């Protein structure tokens, strides 16, 4: 028996006008965790869609070999029969169905011509217990957090006797503890002989869990080797095709006068009216600085930002000042009129209309300035879109391209472009580089520095401590809805931030 459970040889895949994969070779050893890394657009997802049968045999060139046998998958069912299961970044569970119904959807056991529900739920219980997932099989998926939904997806894959498990950015929306649980599950699966292909931009996770690493760039295999023969910097330079001397381009900022101030601000849960999510928070942000806001998931950072922007349903109390003048914000329109912009942590749900093109998305919050007597100036709309595509280096064949077809990094740049066009005085960035490759991250960091130099007050919320420490001039730490620490960057380190984030005084 070959030591390689999977070989993909000379895989080439073309779309109209684009060669997505160019003679790619990819080999995975039996029972290993193999990380597949590369910038967005490098070809990782395309390669996995070929392996999982989404792109059927005949639409690509090359061979897929499993256990020494050439396979010609014509659909997803074919690949599942060979023991391949893929878990996408955007989960595919049916939220109105129970955990058990989701796990066996389309594969329900039958007894006497009807679905054997007793077996569905007993098997679900067994799978969840094996994975140490504390979830009731009868619970509807809509009542589970993202972390538990991710575990249910894994249980679903294992119910189909998956031998090769593909995970695409599995931790992008997980908390630190959920991420740790997931990585431990994958380590246990490895001990039980399951082979994992792990796609992630989070190199710390890659180096914790992977046995081998393959780097793709521009649709080509650049390097495959044991993890021990890589460093993070080496992986990054192979991914982007150039050496990044520093991951965080820290600029010398000179903080000026206070531009934005929040006083005695309290935000209440919109479903539990008496529950405080943010409790009597006060802070100031200055012109010419990046104010970082750190804290654990669930601390209330996103609710604070969304409430300031007028986009959170819960009741609020307190005062907001802009350039020393008290302002009232009840809706996002109010915030935009005052020059406050908010880039949400979930760009696809709250930042973009993905079925619209680049031009329309950039224009969306700016129709007041693009219109006269309620007539839209289409020439101005085109001119502004082309300007920001050029300035932000948005990779798109045309401003008429649907945003859904852009990479994550370029989608994020479109969101930034629409807010830049609104000429903000204050820009709140919530997880600005989530799900974005290292090259695009570097470009967004440079853009943040440029905005600060232009006099924009930048507030950055991030769950990545290296990002907070690498880009902030000053850091606030939120714990359970309260500010539990404040540090100038010269005095900040990971230990101090985590101490405050976990409730230390």
From Swiss-Prot:
<keyword id="KW-1003">Cell membrane</keyword>
<keyword id="KW-0813">Transport</keyword>
<dbReference type="GO" id="GO:0005524">
    <property type="term" value="F:ATP binding"/>
</dbReference>
<comment type="similarity">
    <text>Belongs to the ABC transporter superfamily. Xylose importer (TC 3.A.1.2.4) family.</text>
</comment>
<keyword id="KW-0067">ATP-binding</keyword>
<keyword id="KW-0547">Nucleotide-binding</keyword>
<dbReference type="Pfam" id="PF00005">
    <property type="entry name" value="ABC_tran"/>
</dbReference>
<dbReference type="InterPro" id="IPR003439">
    <property type="entry name" value="ABC_transporter-like_ATP-bd"/>
</dbReference>
<dbReference type="InterPro" id="IPR003593">
    <property type="entry name" value="AAA+_ATPase"/>
</dbReference>
<feature type="binding site">
    <location>
        <begin position="38"/>
        <end position="45"/>
    </location>
    <ligand>
        <name>ATP</name>
    </ligand>
</feature>
<dbReference type="InterPro" id="IPR027417">
    <property type="entry name" value="P-loop_NTPase"/>
</dbReference>
<keyword id="KW-0677">Repeat</keyword>
<protein>
    <recommendedName>
        <fullName>Xylose import ATP-binding protein XylG</fullName>
        <ecNumber>7.5.2.10</ecNumber>
    </recommendedName>
</protein>
<feature type="domain" description="ABC transporter 2">
    <location>
        <begin position="262"/>
        <end position="505"/>
    </location>
</feature>
<comment type="function">
    <text>Part of the ABC transporter complex XylFGH involved in xylose import. Responsible for energy coupling to the transport system.</text>
</comment>
<dbReference type="GO" id="GO:0015614">
    <property type="term" value="F:ABC-type D-xylose transporter activity"/>
</dbReference>
<keyword id="KW-0762">Sugar transport</keyword>
<dbReference type="InterPro" id="IPR017871">
    <property type="entry name" value="ABC_transporter-like_CS"/>
</dbReference>
<dbReference type="InterPro" id="IPR050107">
    <property type="entry name" value="ABC_carbohydrate_import_ATPase"/>
</dbReference>
<keyword id="KW-1278">Translocase</keyword>
<feature type="domain" description="ABC transporter 1">
    <location>
        <begin position="6"/>
        <end position="243"/>
    </location>
</feature>
<dbReference type="GO" id="GO:0005886">
    <property type="term" value="C:plasma membrane"/>
</dbReference>
<comment type="subunit">
    <text>The complex is composed of two ATP-binding proteins (XylG), two transmembrane proteins (XylH) and a solute-binding protein (XylF).</text>
</comment>
<dbReference type="GO" id="GO:0016887">
    <property type="term" value="F:ATP hydrolysis activity"/>
</dbReference>
<keyword id="KW-0472">Membrane</keyword>
